Amino acid sequence: QTFVAGAFIVLLLAAMYRLRGVNAEEKKLRPVLLAVLIAATALRIGLAATNTGYETDINCFTAWGQIAANVGPANFYSEGFCDYPPGYLYVLGLQGLIGNLLNLTPGSAAYLVLLKLPAIASDAAICYLLYRMGCRAGKPSWALLAAAAWAMMPAALLDSAMWGQIDSVLALLILLVLDA
């Protein structure tokens, strides 16, 4: 739980840091965007803690994270079943290490939040990126509307916070490329 709170604070500080140096209309919208980010992230954390998710994937993510944490990435694919490429397994391995360090019980609310945290953080980053991209197009109020729509879109809430899917991680990477 401490890790979740710390990650949430870091995410908020990063968002606030990126919001500096903007025009007058954007400056007026900052508190609203921050409120949207806080509300959306808090809602996702609450949903993540209270929903088991898509059990097959959650169980696989848990097992793969613990295996990666115990045997390391070099020996991960030597035994057992895994249908994920190596990239995200580094994230799962880190989650397994954190879960072990914090003595979290797999399946507990805290462990569920830990597993879903990369997707939740990606959702928040997508929200901010949509806002930033819209502001660059010269439409801060429309940018805020797009960010808020993403933040509270039921499909995004269901996918990341409730089911524990990581589609938003890839979506974030695609948006970062488009924003570059």
Model-derived regions: residue spans:
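Start-transfer (signal-anchor) and selected internal transmembrane alpha helices
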Residues: Q1-G46, C135, A143
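Membrane-embedded alpha-helical segments of multi-pass membrane proteins
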Residues: T2-L11, L117-A125, S168-L173
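Short helix- or helix-capping micro-motifs
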Residues: A40, A146-A151
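Extracytosolic helix-loop segments that constitute the early lumenal/periplasmic catalytic or substrate-binding loops
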Residues: D57-G87, L94-T105
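Catalytic cores of eukaryotic secretory-pathway lumenal/extracellular enzymes that build
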Residues: S78, P85, K116, L129, ...
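Transmembrane-helix motifs of polytopic, lipid-linked glycan transferases
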Residues: V113-G138
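Specific aromatic-rich, kink-prone transmembrane helix
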Residues: L129-R132, V169-A180
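Short acidic/glycine- and proline-prone juxtamembrane loop motifs at membrane-interface regions
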Residues: A161-D167
